[in-house]
Amino acid sequence: ECGDWYARRLYQRDYPAYEAHLKKYGHPSQAGYKDVLRTWNPDKLDPAAYTRLFYEAGARYLFILGVHHDNYDLWNSRYQPWNSVNIGPHRDLLGEWATAIRRQGMHFGITFHHEYSWWWWQTAFECDSTGPYAGVPYDGRLVYESARGKWWEPYPLQWLYGISLREYKTMDEFVNRPEEGIFARHRDYARWYTTQWALRIEDAIEKYDPDFIYTDGNTLQPFCGIRTGTGTKSDAAQR
């Protein structure tokens, strides 16, 4: 589906993902990434078979993706309703991998990439600038509507896409990251976001007891990367 940044780039007309999404799912003002997740069904995925293959090739540990920048947890997440058990394949994919890896006698790690989700989804709040859908907002606008009567009820869409940062400061272009320090000026949102960031990591650790974890940034300051505002520090390392 056009790479691991497909979810962000399906809302950007200058990327191939936009055209690919248009042909397969429809215009992102009506069918966005949420609709990709709804129909996602990796029915050919067999963690046990892949684990045996990796072991025979010489691997003795595997890191498995827990969540990417798309903010969609690949386990039965306690703190993120947009997960692979509730929506999409209805499978605890991380749990399947953990079981297969342990049965093979290998070490097991989980990677977490949801540090960037707070800015990564800003493209979903944009719109086409030209063409028949010019000015029609993409489906990020739906985070401000009730989930009642929608196919994703009872899961708030805001928990997937987040909020439009235009609530805080008008930004006309999202090249990569918003300007430095935005969280420092909006402490309530920073506190909520960093708490959820840590709770989701702790939830996966408690459920699957990995030998290693990896997270973007580091375990002390989840928003320490280049040009990100540190906001409220959240330490998952204590667990």
Regions found by a protein language model. Give the residues of each.
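Mature catalytic domains of secreted/periplasmic carbohydrate-active enzymes
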Residues: 1-239
